[in-house]
Amino acid sequence: MSNKAVANRYAVALFELAEEKGQTDVFERELELVQEVFETTPQLETVLAQPGLAADKKQALLRDAFQAHLSPAVMNTINLLMERGRYSEIVGLAGEYKQLNDDKKGIAEATVFSVKALSDSEKNQIAAVFAPKAGKRELRVVNVVDSALIGGLKVRVGDRVFDGSIQGQLKRLEKQLVAGQ
């Protein structure tokens, strides 16, 4: 089973429990904390990957680090991953859980490629225009500056791409010209 599938399976189980308890956002914040610790402390994963370190010591390390900050359900999920030797799925679990929670709320992330950095006002306008097109209530806009676009915007929401860039228009024109020969 792929890493993403494993992380998703645990995320779905935890999300269902969170929904029952009415704590989906609380669990998300807790998992974001765990993800942040793993991402800012690469040594942690190195230690957890050590085959010479006993599994119970690895669990104790994480328990000591997180127990005061996590609900029992989130801590138990992390412990379960550790027991099964799937420490590398902890960060993936956080991402998958966030995706589930966002889907439930009708929120998606939009990557907007532009020639120059966008202002907050421009990001808000783009979110307002593209959220309904993507079938979402709200979009979180992440701006990526790409000078190859020449001008205009390219917006990616999930697997959908809205290409209004000059580069995209030129490519479409080229295809039409080649097809018309």
Swiss-Prot record:
InterPro entries: ATP_synth_OSCP/delta_N_sf, ATPase_OSCP/d_CS, ATPase_OSCP/dsu. One of its GO terms (molecular function) is proton-transporting ATP synthase activity, rotational mechanism. Its main location: membrane. It is a peripheral membrane protein. GO terms for cellular component: plasma membrane; proton-transporting ATP synthase complex. PROSITE patterns: ATPASE_DELTA. The keyword Signal does not apply. F-type ATPases have 2 components, F(1) - the catalytic core - and F(0) - the membrane proton channel. F(1) has five subunits: alpha(3), beta(3), gamma(1), delta(1), epsilon(1). F(0) has three main subunits: a(1), b(2) and c(10-14). The alpha and beta chains form an alternating ring which encloses part of the gamma chain. F(1) is attached to F(0) by a central stalk formed by the gamma and epsilon chains, while a peripheral stalk is formed by the delta and b chains. Belongs to the ATPase delta chain family. This is ATP synthase subunit delta.
